[in-house]
Regions:
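Active-site-adjacent structural elements in enzyme catalytic cores
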Residues: 2-140
Length: 140
């Protein structure tokens, strides 16, 4: 999935199996949290608490490449695997039409790490993606 920064892979952030699959595909340790992408600020509110500072930053810089670390709401259905069972989440609203279209169609947050094998460079184009990652199946 393209974003305004790097290419990413994504899965339903509320689906434990899908989130664990991302860690497996990327060879990423579970103690390395994954950012969640949201369609809009209202969707962020459903899953995270924003204090006055976070709200000012969100309104000033979202959509865009700013990631805010926010406290997860108790009612949130985001998988605990996204952040290694910690109640804080990296949240972002991307500023790319394809990413937003996917988020609208799914109507859920997406666990969205960069499209690379863990510890390797992030890809800024589809051509630079690691071939090992391109060959891995994410879906069931």
């Amino acid at each position: 999935v393209p974003t305004e920064t790097v290419y990413g892979i994504g899965a339903d952030a509320t689906n434990n199996w899908a989130v664990k699959k991302i860690f497996h595909i990327k060879n990423r340790p579970f103690n390395n949290p994954i950012i969640c992408h949201f369609e809009n600020l209202e969707k962020v509110y459903e899953h995270a608490e924003l204090n006055s500072t976070a709200l000012k930053l969100a309104k000033a810089f979202w959509p865009g490449p700013l990631t805010l670390i926010l406290k997860k709401r108790k009612v949130s259905k985001i998988s605990p695997f996204v952040s290694n069972n910690i109640d804080m989440k990296g949240c972002r609203i991307p500023n790319h039409p394809i990413a937003i279209k996917i988020l609208k169609n799914l109507n859920r947050p997406i666990a969205a790490p960069s499209a690379n094998i863990s510890t390797k460079l992030s890809s800024t184009s589809i051509e630079h993606m690691d071939n090992k990652l391109k060959k891995k199946r994410i879906y069931r």
